[in-house]
Amino acid sequence: IKKYSDHIPHPITLTGTDGESAVVNSAEALWTKSPKDVSDDAYTQFYQSNSGNFDTPFITIHNKSEGSLEFTNLLFIPNQAPFDLFEPERKTKLQLYINRVFITSDLGDLLPQWLRFVRGIIDTPNLDLNVSREILQNSPTLAKIKKAITKKVISELEKKLKKDPENYDAFWQSFGRVMKEGLYEDHDNRDRLLKISRLYSHKQDKFITLQDYVDQMAENQKSIYYLASENLTSAKRSPHLEGFAENGI
């Protein structure tokens, strides 16, 4: 009952052998409330309960989409990287609900793999409760939801980078390696993802965006120069940097 029906809009009562009755589900779903009616503490408690993490969310994304495709998402981008971030399966772990009834958290593809650190729920009335796993994995409805929430997550990260670059840099240190997977794998979102990627600048000795680099290029510089390395320490020690540094690049 707790796993599958805790959030349905009807209380479930269990009567014991002594004749005493008790409601055994919460009969509430936080995501059905208006965001303005939900406190930060309530979001944090739900995030921690839902994800098993102990940090506070870096970004909370709570909205409802209506029309031909109806769904509600309550998503959380963590502050700290989860322990399983680099497991070989690279599974995403969003929970799927249909009309507030829990269906599964093991689909693995409600988000692209490079966003596998995102936690939370998707609730939609546009699927049947008795739908099979095979149908879910090939569902056009879920494909549309995936596309919509991926764009929403990127949009929120764009806003965060613009408004709070210092904390975004801390986020990038935790999740940048994973997000860069999307530059290779996610052709639809590659350009937007590149714009919010942080790259280390030897000249400025800090992480910047590609646009920052272009804006500060020397007047006679026609090319963008980059060095690939296993880590930042190795890159800084590369002898290839000396000539560029001497020329102010």
For the regions a language model picked out, list residue spans one by one:
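Conserved GHKL (Bergerat-fold) ATPase module
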Residues: 2-249
